Amino acid sequence: MMKTYIGIDPGKSGALAVIEENGDIHVWPFNSVKYAEVLTHLASVRDEIKCCVEKVGAMPGQGVVSMFNFGHNFGFIEGLLLGNWIPYQLVPPQTWKKEFCVTSDKNTSIEVCRKLFPHVSLLPTERSRKPSDGMAEAILIAEYARRRF
């Protein structure tokens, strides 16, 4: 029985990360079709899945459209998890960030992720030059799930 740990940053520039028991790490920037493929596949082939989704609330200054889009993404992700019978826990950002000494500065997520997992690319596409903080955070959330559950 192989354990699989999933971390999801549900934001607009978020990502889905998978850490397998053997240490393999996979990460995808937000893409609804890819998320559906990955979660449906994992649910069909894995016996034990531990999933953590970042629990994010409204932030001061965010507009109505921005919050609607965030809620839409979150609902989509929650629907995929529930539809595939994947149990999950909502984890506040402060909780998982404390585990890794990550601050609110998105660059610290990238730095910590690179130290823990130097072999994992944080570039969302082959043409990207800037690492994705959403991908880094999804990996750290998956690692939080691995350590805690």
Map each language-model feature to its residues.
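Phosphate- and other anionic-substrate recognition elements at nucleic-acid/protein interfaces
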Residues: 1-149
